[in-house]
From Swiss-Prot:
Protein name as catalogued: UvrABC system protein C
Keyword Zinc on entry: no
Physiological role: The UvrABC repair system catalyzes the recognition and processing of DNA lesions. UvrC both incises the 5' and 3' sides of the lesion. The N-terminal half is responsible for the 3' incision and the C-terminal half is responsible for the 5' incision.
Example GO biological process: SOS response
Amino acid sequence: MHYRPSPTRIIPRCSNMEILREKLSLLPDKPGVYLMKDASGQIIYVGKAKVLKNRVRSYFTGSHNGKTQLMISLIADFETIITDSEVEALLLECNLIKKHNPKYNILLRDDKTYPFITITDEAHPRILVTRQVKKGAGKYYGPYPNATAAKEAARLLNRLFPFRKCRQIPNKPCLYYHLGQCLGPCQVDVPKEAYDKIRKEAAAFLKGDQGAILKALEKKMKEASENLEFERAKEYRDLMEDLKKVGEKQNITLNDFVDRDVVGYAYTQDQLCIQIFYLRQGKLLSRDNFIFPYYEEPEEAFVSFLAQFYTESSALPQEILLPPLDISVLTKLFPMVVPQKGQKRDLVQMAMENAQTTLHEQISIEIRNLTECTQALAEIGNALGIPSLRTIESFDISNIAGTHSVAGMIQFLDGKPNRSQYRKFKIQPMPNMDDTASMHQVIERRYARLQQENLPLPDLILVDGGKGQIHAALAALHSLNAAIPVAGMVKNDKHQTSALIDAMDRIHSLDRRSAGFRLLERIQNEVHRFAITFHRQQRAKSMTLSELDGIAGVGPKRRQQLLKFFKSIDSIRQATLEELQQSGLPAPAAAAVYQHFNSHKEENHDS
């Protein structure tokens, strides 16, 4: 593939519209990729085009929906890269989105991978659930749409077939051997033919052939019953029922036993919904939904999604069925077809209808949530005399008897958690430091920082406490000349949210069934969770470090080195001398750590 920067790239970035117009006039009549940048030079959107000139110019002409217009208003500059073909442009777009993670390219930003079941190629094979397909490691079946479905199938396989369960072969038989769920390579030499047999049977099960297994289980159940082994007979009966349940879930089938995905989509003015049905061995296993805003034509956004999704796929199905549209670019990369008739076309239509239903449900939920959030903010604002309430920041102090004192701050924007603005604070120790003094310190630090960086202040501060913490927060704000309303969330005897108390010590009770009360309760629970989680992390870290104190040759850097390698103090405690040296410790320090945690064992052994 050959990518050529277009002539527009030699023009320096500038937000001046005259420069942008000049760059637009130089755009080529060729396929390629464009990168939109904001005033700071950050890439905010990456797109592909069959004709760069037409596509890029379209952003600066005509009308657009609200979300697209918002993105366009941030564009201060752009770059283009010319490619030899649409296929190369599509692949380059995928790579650049993955590399730059632009704000407005939200398609598959998590690089989602799907789980597979593998029967390993080990001498004593195992059944594993994995998201990594490695050549030569075993036979893979899937993908499954989620880990729960894969684990459920693997659990059933391990009950049906005596594969090895242990990661390493132990020195003596485990419980699975005694239950007949393992051939016991730790006890006997298992011939290869025995494993080949269960491999074949398990593969048939994963391909949807359950008839032979059900007959074998029914025969074993009858034999156990005749021998008065009723518990064993019950186990076989339960296995048969589980097997039938799996079969019942796969109620849409194609008789050719081909692995295929069926994809449909639906869209509104600014949102796109994509629905994927996963058929494996001709049977529908499950489905997946993706809903996101788009900033180009919906068909183009759909094609970009498919390219990203299947480029990242660990293993492609044999066939991907799509609705009618121009997929000439995609068919050069993936096994995609547009069925014209029959059951395959019906499946695509079903995926399209499901996408439409899912999108409609999502929009209904968003409207309902928006209405409730608007109502909740209005109720809280009316109670406290705040006419326009959008941003709420809430604080909670967490400690045990004044030790490991920390604070958590959360932000809700338009009634929803804005997690990018969550903050953690370690309280700086001072004489007579109690919760009110801690609150004063944290409020002062938070809003002094916002003032220094010229960032917007919230519309309301909520503290998880009473009058003392409210007045501490007000005093801190007064020292900064910051006028922000402050209120406290009062709890009842059961430690549940009950009311608001304002800066004048007035109690404002809200109807427990109201949207405003539900929002307050959610904020109080969330800030408490966030603060106490941080406190526990700090306390555990402190306890871990203190347990390593005093070991000769192990200073702060080596303590951190050990924790980074072993992850926990328990793992360090159980490590062998060789493992301690593998962590990077020199031999004397490793010996000192080993001796520190094992001396009592040796003393007990000697006694």
